[in-house]
Amino acid sequence: MRLHLERIEEIKPEKLLNLLEICLRLRMEDPSLKLTDAFRLFDGFYEGFPGLTIDFYAQTLLITEHDPRRATQPGLHDDIARFYVENLPELNGVLLKRRASKAAGERKGIMIFGERPSTSVAENGVNYALDLQLNQDASFYPDTRNLRLWLHQNLSGASVLNCFAY
């Protein structure tokens, strides 16, 4: 699939918040998410706001800005953080990553709400340690949940080489 992002239009915050509300409601109704505390809340590439993803890791919200042209909208990240803080009572931190930033700290993430990100997640009875600020990505991919479940069910007790590291 090829994504064409040549022209980025400014989106009105109310339109984005409406998209976030719809996606949050759908995620909360998804029974497969009851067995995990790490999942994607919003995938802008597919849900109407290319260049923005929002993930939930235990009690931390991770906002990832993939396209620097989205950074021109002042206050947008604050609006996003406020929306989720109001709608997810268990949330105690919001981390913002700007993938294209020249500043390493922004690529690895800055806290815009709370003091520190979560350091572990649980999924299908397995606990995973994580450091959300170690790299420019999260180092744990919620979208591969079904693959991890399959590996757990089919390769229990086997030695597995992790070829997903870089």
Task: Explain the meaning of each model-derived region.
Residues 62-73:
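A short interface-forming secondary-structure element
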Residues 156-166:
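Conserved class I S-adenosyl-L-methionine
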Residues 47-48, 52-55, 71, 76-145, ...:
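Non-catalytic substrate-recognition/targeting regions of SAM-dependent transferases
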Residues 65, 98, 164:
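Short beta-strand/turn micro-motifs composed of small residues
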